[in-house]
Structures are given as C-alpha cells and as structure tokens.
Amino acid sequence: MKVLVICAVLFLAIFSNSSAETEDDFLEDESFQADDVIPFLASEQVRSDCTLRNHDCTDDRHSCCRSKMFKDVCKCFYPSQRSETDRAKKELCTCQQPKHLKYIEKGLQKAKDYATG
C-alpha cells in the first residue's frame, strides 16, 4: 500500500511538471521581475548579533548564526574534569551544525555544481 501511494505521488509530480508551462513562457512573462529579487538577496547580510559556529553560546542558546541553508544549533556538554564537583559546575555550550544537515548542504551543493557545469 505504501509503495502504491509513493508511486502515485511520483506519477502526479511528473505529470504536473510535464503539463506545466515551459520555462521560456515563464521567463517572457512581464510579472517575472528577477532584477528586483537579485539585489535584495545580494544585500542580505549575516546578523551582527549572532554567535558564530564553534563559539560559546552558553548565555544565549538561541543566538546561533545560520549556515547557507540551516540554522546552527547550540549544543551543550560538560568538559572532562578531575573532580566531581568541578564537573557539575561547568557547562559549556557551542554553536554547531548537526552532521546530517552538513551532509545535506554538501550534497545539494554538489548537485547544483553538477547541474550548472
């Protein structure tokens, strides 16, 4: 049953894509204004108050910066200490990118590079 549903969704996606207007018709449309979008995207900058990757985010755990596609996550851990009392006192948090999101970004970048050139 699951396979049938997946095949039906895939068929509908392919059919709708093939029956849609061609890309040339879309680009000739007057409502398409890519010239207005490109300067906006180029002027977008990284927030100045965000915490960079591998920097301390112990005080503000929601301040991590975004990578190209995904927001980094504040991960906390307890560094190895000699005594048990020192371990309980010191929590260290850093902004990190989860590995699965890192692999997704790399894969999409390689697919984009392959498609463009």
Curated annotation (Swiss-Prot):
InterPro entries noted in UniProt: Spider_toxin_CSTX_knottin (IPR019553), Spider_toxin_CSTX_Knottin_CS (IPR011142)
Residue(s) carrying Threonine amide: T116
Protein name listed in UniProt: Toxin CSTX-8
Domain of life, source organism: Eukaryota
Propeptide: 21-47, 82-87
Annotated signal sequence range: 1-20
GO terms of biological process kind: killing of cells of another organism
Main function: Synergistic toxin that induces or increases a cytolytic effect when combined with CSTX-1 (AC P81694) or CSTX-9 (AC P58604). When alone, has a weak insecticidal activity, with an unknown molecular target.
Localisation per UniProt entry: Secreted; Target cell membrane
